From Swiss-Prot:
Keyword annotations: ATP-binding, Ligase, Metal-binding, Nucleotide-binding, Queuosine biosynthesis, Zinc
Cofactor note: Binds 1 zinc ion per subunit.
Species assigned in the record: Prochlorococcus marinus (strain MIT 9303)
NCBIfam families, alphabetized: 7-cyano-7-deazaguanine synthase QueC (TIGR00364)
A GO MF label: ligase activity, forming carbon-nitrogen bonds
Entry protein name: 7-cyano-7-deazaguanine synthase
The protein's role, per its UniProt record: Catalyzes the ATP-dependent conversion of 7-carboxy-7-deazaguanine (CDG) to 7-cyano-7-deazaguanine (preQ(0)).
Residues noted as binding ATP in the record, renumbered to the chain: 10-20
CDD domains the UniProt entry points to: QueC-like (cd01995)
Amino acid sequence: MSDSTTIALLSGGLDSATAAALAIEAGQKVIGLSFDYGQRHRKELQAAEELAACMGLTEHHVISVNLGSWGGSSLTDLTQTVPSEGVVDGVIPNTYVPGRNTVFIAIGLSLAEARHANRLVLGVNAMDYSGYPDCRPDYLKAYQSLADLANKAGREGHGIKLWAPLMHWHKKRIVQEALRLGVPIDKTWSCYSGGDHACGICDSCRIRDAALSEAGRSDLCSKPAP
């Protein structure tokens, strides 16, 4: 692989697909990396596969890391309820999965080093998901410092950059960029509820649908089962 290769953490959702598309636009070869971590919304994995094919990714890997073994989140523990009352400032919602991004980034860095990639792109953004501790600028800054020390590439002076281009964007801007880049939004999956149809009421659906409507694309909003 060349030094113009990016590893994209591809969940199957709108944010990660847009981040991957930005890497493609920048002329990078993009390798997708997705995770089966015991999430209730497993349909996102199907979405990730379809996105990888549609977007022409160089490779796409799906890794099993069963964080559902110990639960701790409504996304991995079916006894908990996915919230639909909206994000509360200063409160970490129960959709936070303990250690998820820390684990995913570590595996992404391993793949990046093996493929001699120079970047790892993530779709995290602090504006709409400020309750998640592992989606914040200070978290990524600290992780970058660790990454530069933790692998051969970093020690040799050509470390792997953690790139979060959406970090300070609101959802409407993400939608606008996705449309500009030709991201197949209809193939992305954001719903947390775990059904075959997007519920339209979980926080993830509500934030996505509001942004799509603001961007004039209400036709792409959730269509719950009748």
